[in-house]
């Protein structure tokens, strides 16, 4: 649960408002460790999960009907800071006008960014996790085919990291 601070322009006083959400509450009722970090501008819950608890939380959300991994991506908090893996889940059904959504964030140490793969829960994670591996160097443990997907196989480094130094020259091997 997060406290969001708002300040009234009229009197200059600060009010503290507690942020909760039904998805976070359901995870809490199951005893699954997580932290609700807030809501985005569309009131979608953003939940922080430690890597060792990701699979348990992901399975619980899948069991609760979050059957679609709309997006998975890696991100970099900045040079010297942590890397992360983000999962945007949707509960799709035939009659849903505005289906529930949730965003999970997992923060990883820069020097050893490892997190379990959710491929075995949502198959749409396949190429998305491969892209995060290719661009950020995040290792998705248990992924069936974790190889580069965009960069040449012999590329050195992780091009989307904020501390990446672009090489002055790279020679492509001729396929013929």
UniProtKB/Swiss-Prot annotation:
Enzyme Commission numbers on file: 7.1.1.-
Membrane topology value: Peripheral membrane protein
Single GO molecular function: quinone binding
One GO CC term, this protein: plasma membrane
Cystine connections: none
Entry's localization field: Cell inner membrane
Superkingdom, natural source: Bacteria
Entry similarity comment: Belongs to the complex I 30 kDa subunit family.
Subunit structure: NDH-1 can be composed of about 15 different subunits; different subcomplexes with different compositions have been identified which probably have different functions.
Protein name, UniProt field: NAD(P)H-quinone oxidoreductase subunit J
């Amino acid at each position: 649960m997060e406290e969001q601070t708002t300040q009234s322009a009229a009197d200059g006083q600060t009010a503290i408002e507690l942020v909760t959400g039904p998805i976070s509450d359901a995870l809490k009722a199951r005893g699954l460790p997580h932290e609700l970090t807030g809501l985005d501008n569309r009131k979608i819950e953003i939940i922080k999960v430690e890597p060792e608890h990701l699979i348990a939380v992901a399975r619980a959300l899948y069991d609760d009907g979050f059957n679609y991994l709309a997006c998975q991506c890696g991100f970099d908090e900045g040079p010297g800071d942590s890397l992360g893996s983000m999962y945007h889940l949707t509960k799709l059904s035939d009659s849903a006008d505005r289906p529930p959504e949730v965003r999970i964030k997992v923060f990883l140490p820069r020097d050893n960014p490892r997190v379990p793969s959710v491929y075995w829960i949502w198959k749409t994670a396949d190429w998305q996790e491969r892209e995060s591996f290719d661009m950020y160097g995040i290792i998705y443990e248990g992924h069936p085919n974790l190889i580069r997907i965009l960069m040449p196989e012999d590329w050195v480094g992780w091009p989307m990291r904020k501390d990446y130094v672009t090489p002055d020259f790279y020679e492509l091997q001729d396929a013929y």
